[in-house]
């Protein structure tokens, strides 16, 4: 099972996302701002259109889709609390439930929080980790210790031999 999980997160799979992340480093501040604004608007519009939770939250706050035109408009959006995420995680989804994987936060600041991830977000996160480590001089295959709070409760630690990584 560990080899399958590793393979699904390996370089050949995440290569397109690595290119996307690397491109961020060559952008000017203005290009980066425009990119971030475009992504914010895409995410907001998807949440408004596809998520029952967000649509209701924004409607009750008097926010229409056309009210959010730029990144500065993020100030208009209601704050979302951990309690809201705990109570409405399924309603927050913008894709069918079968398309996501359940994950949990570590609960470092209190109770663990159930969240959902789709494969593209997992691959994008892997790409960020890959690029960051590579920029700091890390070569894959070198021993690595990863301190993360998302191990199964039965595991105190996990050694992934394919990546030479020890997870705590």
Region roles according to the model:
Residues 1-104, 111-126, 130-141, 150:
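Nucleotide 5′-phosphate-binding alpha/beta core
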Residues 131, 143-168:
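AMP-binding/adenylate-forming
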């Amino acid at each position: 099972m560990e080899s399958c999980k590793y393979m699904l997160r390996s370089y050949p799979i995440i290569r397109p996302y690595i290119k996307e992340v690397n491109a961020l480093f060559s952008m000017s501040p203005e290009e980066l701002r425009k990119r971030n604004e475009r992504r914010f608007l895409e995410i907001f519009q998807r949440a408004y259109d596809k998520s029952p939770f967000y649509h209701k939250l924004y409607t009750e706050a008097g926010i229409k889709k056309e009210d959010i035109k730029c990144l500065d408009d993020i100030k208009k959006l209601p704050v979302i609390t951990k309690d809201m995420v705990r109570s409405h995680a399924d309603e927050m989804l913008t894709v069918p439930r079968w398309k996501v994987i359940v994950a949990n936060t570590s609960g470092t600041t209190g109770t663990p929080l159930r969240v959902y991830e789709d494969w593209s977000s997992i691959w994008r996160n892997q790409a960020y980790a890959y690029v960051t480590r590579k920029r700091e001089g890390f070569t894959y295959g070198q021993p690595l210790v990863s301190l993360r709070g998302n191990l199964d409760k039965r595991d105190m630690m996990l050694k992934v031999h394919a990546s030479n990584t020890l997870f705590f």
